[in-house]
């Protein structure tokens, strides 16, 4: 249970018991990262149900759906998105990009990209129709994005070989962790397809394409992954999944 509490304490603002961060507990902590996504998905489902019950309009519904994950996670992943945007926007050599990721200052690229991202994600949520199976497909998105992020962390090289991400990956049994996280990914994908085959297929495709982009970008630009890059991927993946649900719903109407 200590690994679970460490994962929840690290990747969310949810109140959990304080435990010692020993090597044994850290070795399994990343495997519980998707649990935070499950909690966010449940809260998201409650919010969307409340919006439907009270006939709340798309703007307020979208604002809540956008802000809820940020509030629960403490914006830790959005911070990584901003740091990565600064690094990519600098067009500097790899070593300099890694230094920018560690810089606590916020640059112009981070502010611009963050604003554009939030506007885009808000607009996408406004277009989503949380009805039928697609409703619950949307709620599985946060768990799938975190499963893929964790899988990348324990499968791909660490760009720095140190840092917060290394705190979790160095003590772990990488093979066992990969098995657990692959099972998380399979479970989330299977759940999406079972809930709504059409919307689920689009959503899974969006998540996997985001994962492929993450692999190519992180390798070419940084030589591996970091915690900030993981946050960048997670934000991109979640926006892509909601966008895919919107596309699935629109195409289904045309057919």
Which residues are covered by each model-predicted region?
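Hydrophobic alpha-helical transmembrane segments
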Residues: 1-74, 92, 96-98, 103-255
């Amino acid at each position: 249970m200590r690994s679970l509490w460490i994962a929840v304490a690290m990747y969310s603002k949810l109140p959990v018991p304080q435990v010692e961060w020993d090597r044994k507990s850290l070795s399994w902590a990343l495997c519980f990262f998707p649990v935070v996504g499950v909690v966010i998905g449940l809260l998201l489902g409650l919010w969307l149900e409340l919006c439907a019950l009270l006939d709340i309009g798309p703007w307020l519904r979208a604002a809540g759906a956008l802000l809820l994950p940020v509030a629960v996670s403490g914006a830790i992943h959005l911070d990584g998105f901003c740091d990565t945007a600064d690094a990519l926007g600098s067009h500097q050599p790899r070593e300099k990009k890694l230094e920018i990721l560690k810089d606590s200052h916020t640059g112009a690229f981070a502010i611009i990209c963050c604003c554009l991202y939030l506007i885009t994600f808000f607009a996408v949520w406004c277009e989503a129709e949380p009805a039928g199976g697609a409703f619950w497909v949307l709620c599985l998105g946060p768990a799938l994005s975190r499963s893929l992020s964790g899988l990348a962390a324990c499968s791909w090289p660490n760009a720095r070989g140190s840092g917060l991400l290394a705190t979790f990956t160095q003590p772990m049994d990488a093979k066992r962790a990969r098995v657990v996280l692959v099972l998380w990914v399979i479970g989330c994908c299977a759940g999406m397809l079972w809930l709504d085959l059409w919307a689920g297929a689009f959503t899974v495709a969006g998540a996997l394409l985001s994962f492929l982009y993450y692999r190519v970008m992180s390798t070419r630009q940084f030589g591996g992954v970091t915690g900030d890059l993981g946050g960048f991927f997670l934000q991109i993946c979640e926006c892509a999944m909601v966008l895919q649900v919107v596309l699935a719903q629109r195409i289904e109407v045309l057919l």
